């Protein structure tokens, strides 16, 4: 048997980093479900970004530092035109800080202004590099923390939420919508830098020539109005496009997870057509979005071009009248380019911002979902239950549908082996789903060890159960890690012992990689019987006081069924066991049979007698001394 890898759990550094991140994400979620929040997206993002306030502060300073550097870049051009080409004296500050040789001759002055330009450009690029590195680091940390919060929260949501949602939609919101948090940062800081640049250049331009500054400013209100009008349309279009894309992803995931069925029925073209329909709808939404973006960029570009032309006309007129020098006009035109550049970029930045806001709103809508199954504030811990189960007048219906269970009274003694039988859809699986608090009953009370389930902490309650499903659920990892899924830190010897108890060790040891064997997606590299025995081994290792099995032998051959039944017998020893099955051979292993029929539970007695007429379980039989509930 190979133990080369299955005892490993990844590198310590990686695991420690993941643990820290999960703890931080869990702390941000808090111990209770989040309440619906109505604060603005920006406010929520800022609140979530508080752990990275120092980095965000540094990014803000870098954005502000870019403004004076940008203002200095055109200065060498003005000096060269006015003092090297023209006859105007160089600025006095140069004489104060530079040796006379650098300013007394045209050659020295030209070399000086050239070096100034290189120095200013280098510093500007250095600030841009620092902004890129720090921004990427901060954005990625924010993103992975936000994704962890989303993923943890989605797993905490009740099964009723997942019953109503496509897997693809949830995956899209975690993987893609969440990434808009990073995109928002990438859009906000350039806008902040652009605003700082706009103010700085405006001040300098006013100092040079207030008339030209006034002419340049006339386009501002038009740009703001256009950006606001198209900004609302852009966010709406982004919501539409992302909705269609998530639907397309749902089709892909659904089809790939059911490839055997799709291939067996020859429905590849049908599924491709279904995907194309959704992809085409998404493509159409993207084309509409591109049209809106293009129109916004066109209008802003036209407005700034008109502003530039107006400044040029007024500026040339003033040069001809000797009101300003040619160098002053050139520096104003250079500043005007810098002034209008943020406005011209606004089309793209506004589009990026609206895309980010639309995605973040969708992601936050998931965080705003409140689990239907909630933990009470004063919930008590539960170490290990004895396994006594009681249902008192329990009713349940799925979201306004007809009741699946109605007035169920049931008592299971600790350590007993009970079989649940009944027609398909009678409510057997619903019964055990209520016991594990995947759902809460719409009426009545379920008790464990004499205490209402809702009085226990949810995590402690669910740790009392080991579950073996009709269709075994394995993860795309090694056999050992699948067996240890309920006890991730189990030692290798315990894993092997659990496999032996489940009659799985022999086939595992016969595999080339033994317990290190990768099982593939959903365990499809193993046979159905092998998957079921690995699932049983997982239940053995879990060592929970209550065992729930849902048709564990429904899809295996006779020999495999015999091996599984033997393992089930060992697994049930000393545990309260609920076994859902239709097979008489499996029912014979049970101490008692309960039939679920018409939303009620009837007692079938011993296994061999369960086919005879069965009386409905009465509450006074199950709970001596209980008063019958009044009937209407």
Residue ranges and their predicted role:
Residues 1-73, 85-117, 123, 127-135, ...:
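Membrane-integrated ABC transporters
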Residues 30-38, 61-62, 69-86, 116, ...:
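Juxtamembrane helix-loop junctions of ABC transporter transmembrane domains
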Residues 50-54, 159-160, 176-184, 188, ...:
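An intracellular "coupling" helix at the cytosolic face of ABC transporter transmembrane type-1 domains
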Residues 55-68, 189-240, 311-324, 341:
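Transmembrane helices of ABC transporter permease
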Residues 117-124, 128, 220-227, 293-307, ...:
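Hydrophobic alpha-helical segments in the permease module
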Residues 154, 275, 363, 391-393:
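Conserved catalytic Walker-motif region of ABC-type ATPase nucleotide-binding domains
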């Amino acid at each position: 048997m190979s133990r080369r890898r299955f005892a490993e759990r990844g590198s310590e550094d990686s695991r420690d980093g993941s643990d820290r991140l999960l703890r931080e994400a869990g702390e941000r979620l808090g111990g209770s479900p989040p309440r619906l929040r109505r604060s603005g997206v920006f406010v929520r993002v800022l609140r979530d970004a508080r752990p990275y306030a120092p980095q965000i502060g540094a990014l803000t300073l870098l954005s502000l530092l870019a403004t004076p550097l940008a203002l200095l870049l055109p200065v060498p051009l003005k000096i060269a035109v006015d003092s090297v080409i023209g006859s105007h004296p160089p600025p006095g500050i140069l004489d104060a800080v530079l040796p006379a040789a650098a300013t007394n001759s045209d050659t020295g002055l030209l070399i000086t202004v050239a070096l100034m330009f290189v120095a200013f450009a280098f510093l500007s690029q250095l600030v841009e590099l620092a902004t890129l590195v720090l921004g990427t680091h901060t954005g990625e940390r924010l993103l992975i923390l936000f994704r962890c919060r989303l993923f943890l929260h989605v797993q905490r949501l009740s099964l009723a939420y997942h019953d109503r949602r496509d897997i693809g939609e949830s995956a899209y919101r975690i993987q893609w919508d969440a990434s808009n948090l990073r995109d928002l940062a990438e859009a906000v800081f350039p806008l902040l830098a652009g605003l700082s640049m706009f103010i700085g250049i405006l001040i300098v331009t006013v100092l040079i020539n207030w008339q030209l500054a006034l002419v340049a400013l006339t386009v501002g209100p038009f740009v703001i109005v256009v950006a606001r009008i198209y900004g609302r349309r852009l966010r709406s279009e982004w919501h539409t496009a992302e909705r269609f894309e998530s639907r397309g992803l749902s089709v892909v995931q659904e089809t790939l997870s059911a490839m055997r069925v799709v291939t067996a029925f020859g429905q590849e073209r049908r599924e491709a057509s279904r995907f194309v329909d959704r992809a085409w709808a998404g493509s159409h939404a993207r084309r509409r979005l591109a049209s809106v973006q293009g129109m916004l960029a066109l209008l802003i570009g036209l407005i700034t071009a008109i502003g530039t032309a107006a400044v040029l006309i007024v500026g040339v007129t003033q040069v001809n009248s000797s009101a300003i020098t040619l160098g002053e006009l050139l520096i104003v035109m250079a500043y005007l380019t810098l002034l209008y550049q943020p406005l011209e970029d606004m089309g793209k930045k506004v589009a990026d911002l609206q895309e980010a806001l639309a995605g973040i709103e969708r992601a936050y809508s998931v965080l705003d979902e409140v689990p239907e199954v909630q933990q009470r504030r004063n919930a008590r811990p539960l170490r290990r239950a004895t396994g006594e189960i009681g249902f008192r007048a329990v009713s349940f219906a799925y979201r306004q549908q007809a009741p699946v269970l109605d007035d169920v009274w049931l008592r299971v003694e600790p350590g007993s082996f009970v079989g649940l039988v009944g027609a398909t859809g009678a409510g057997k699986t619903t019964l055990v789903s209520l016991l594990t608090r995947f759902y809460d009953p719409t009426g009545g009370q379920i008790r464990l060890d004499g205490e209402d389930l809702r009085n226990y902490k949810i995590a402690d309650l669910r740790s009392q159960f080991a579950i073996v499903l009709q269709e075994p659920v394995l993860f795309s990892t090694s056999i050992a890690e699948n067996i240890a899924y309920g006890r991730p830190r189990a030692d290798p010897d315990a894993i092997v012992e659990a496999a032996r108890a489940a009659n799985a060790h022999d086939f595992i040891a016969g595999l080339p990689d033994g317990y290190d064997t990768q099982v593939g997606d959903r365990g499809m590299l193993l046979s159905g019987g092998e998957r079921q025995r690995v699932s049983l081994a997982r239940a053995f290792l879990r060592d929970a006081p209550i065992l729930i099995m849902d048709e564990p032998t429904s899809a295996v051959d006779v020999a495999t069924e015999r091996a599984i039944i033997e393992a089930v017998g060992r697994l049930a020893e000393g545990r309260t066991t609920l076994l859902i099955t239709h097979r008489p051979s499996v029912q014979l292993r049970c101490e008692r049979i309960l039939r679920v029929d018409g939303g009620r539970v009837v007692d079938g007695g011993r296994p061999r007698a369960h086919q005879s007429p069965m009386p409905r379980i009465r509450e006074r039989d199950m709970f001596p001394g209980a008063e019958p509930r009044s009937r209407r």
